[in-house]
Amino acid sequence: MGSDHHHRKLHVMFFPFMAYGHMIPTLDMAKLFSSRGAKSTILTTSLNSKILQKPIDTFKNLNPGLEIDIQIFNFPCVELGLPEGCENVDFFTSNNNDDKNEMIVKFFFSTRFFKDQLEKLLGTTRPDCLIADMFFPWATEAAGKFNVPRLVFHGTGYFSLCAGYCIGVHKPQKRVASSSEPFVIPELPGNIVITEEQIIDGDGESDMGKFMTEVRESEVKSSGVVLNSFYELEHDYADFYKSCVQKRAWHIGPLSVYNRGFEEKAERGKKANIDEAECLKWLDSKKPNSVIYVSFGSVAFFKNEQLFEIAAGLEASGTSFIWVVRKTKDDREEWLPEGFEERVKGKGMIIRGWAPQVLILDHQATGGFVTHCGWNSLLEGVAAGLPMVTWPVGAEQFYNEKLVTQVLRTGVSVGASKHMKVMMGDFISREKVDKAVREVLAGEAAEERRRRAKKLAAMAKAAVEEGGSSFNDLNSFMEEFSS
């Protein structure tokens, strides 16, 4: 009986929050587990399943015999007080309505509707474990009813979790004279300096504050945490996290590195708004390390005045660039200086919508990355060996910036100083954009940063190879939940 059990495939269920920044790494994770012999099931809604199906089909064609599938849950948006077709945070970030923030909070709470469906599925399927997004705190209780271990997937790294923990425990922001006065985060290794304006609002009385308390409590009761990170990137913080915050944690990243082929890299997320081959051909015509790639992820939003400053700053820097803007051609182009595209023709490329990010970052012509410091983007930049210009907007991005600029020392801050609840960026002048872009690409300090970044990229690749830290952590996770 015992030996039969070991021949049975480990069955892992994955339940990502419905946002690209959560679904893409979860898809990578499900592919990784099935490539190591597990059966992976991703739980999502009908509209979101369409985003995942094509990359899953590609993966299955490349790896016949591996098991990965999708289980669809019902999400009646209108009944839940949400607009029709609103099954992904992208719905709000693509349509900048006045009540966007209110609706996003409603969206978070509406996901509780999945609880009964999840319990029904767990009762009939009994997987070996459930890796559910941090934003589904009720999943711990649902899984517990059927003795299914629930793991939390955070979608961020050790550093930001430790920083948030230390600030939550010690509340150093209460002891400074003003919200812009810098302070050192107590207990956190590395003497990390931050301001109150840059930390996540800890208002425990707001709806979102209460929700985040629930998130933390459900993590304490869970069977542990799975992280998209690797030990060498943030070893001090991995050790701190496991000794002070959550004893059971496994790092299995960087997940983007497992996508080896052109097709797999091109199919992460939405269909790109540019032909991938055309984009790579443009990069092929540029010198190594000469192009700056500018992208602020799928959620951050900038007003036209800010986009205008970015355009002017890029033009002033004289650097070749690829700039991803969440705009369509139909938008009146008031956010661009007059004649801008004509003047930068051949030197700059604007992609409106979605870009094949990993393909661009991995290209030898790309020499730097202007990023909002979302964890997925940051890790993709690390894996590509790129120095970064950090421009955090909201969520845990200011913590991630500190990791890049103060710990890894592979980045230059553009000077964003305020955490924005609505993910609308702090205003930065063209002069600051120009200065940061030049600083990250040229000069002696830039070469030092590039050397450090290349070293980290080599460590990232080694971590996922046989015998690497993430390879071994995945092994120990699979052994733990198979027994």
From Swiss-Prot:
Q: What is this protein called?
A: UDP-glucosyl transferase 73B2
UniProt keywords, alphabetically: Flavonoid biosynthesis, Glycosyltransferase, Transferase
Q: Which sites are catalytic?
A: H22 (proton acceptor), D133 (charge relay)
Any GO MF annotation of the entry: flavonol 3-O-glucosyltransferase activity
Tissues where this protein is expressed? Expressed in roots and flowers.
Q: In which pathway does it act?
A: Secondary metabolite biosynthesis; flavonoid biosynthesis
Tell me the organism: Arabidopsis thaliana (Mouse-ear cress)
Task: Briefly state the protein's biological role.
Answer: Catalyzes the glycosylation of flavonoids from UDP-glucose. Uses a wide range of flavonoid substrates including flavonols (quercetin, kaempferol, isorhamnetin, 3-OH 7,2',4'-MeO-flavone), flavones (luteolin, apigenin), flavanones (naringenin, hesperetin), flavanonols (taxifolin), isoflavones (genistein, daidzein), flavonol glycosides (quercitrin, isoquercitrin, rutin), and chalcones (isoliquiritigenin).
Q: Where is UDP-alpha-D-glucose bound in this sequence?
A: A355, Q357, H372, W375, N376, S377, E380, E396, Q397
Q: Name one GO biological process term.
A: response to other organism
**InterPro entries (alphabetical):** UDP_glucos_trans, UDP_glycos_trans_CS
Q: Give the catalysed reaction(s), semicolon-separated.
A: a 7-O-hydroxy-flavonol + UDP-alpha-D-glucose = a flavonol 7-O-beta-D-glucoside + UDP + H(+)
Q: Which residues bind an anthocyanidin?
A: H22, A395
Its EC number(s): 2.4.1.-, 2.4.1.237
Q: What induces it?
A: Not induced by salicylic acid.
Which SUPFAM superfamilies does the record match to this protein?
UDP-Glycosyltransferase/glycogen phosphorylase
- Which EC class, in a word? transferase
Gene that this sequence comes from: UGT73B2
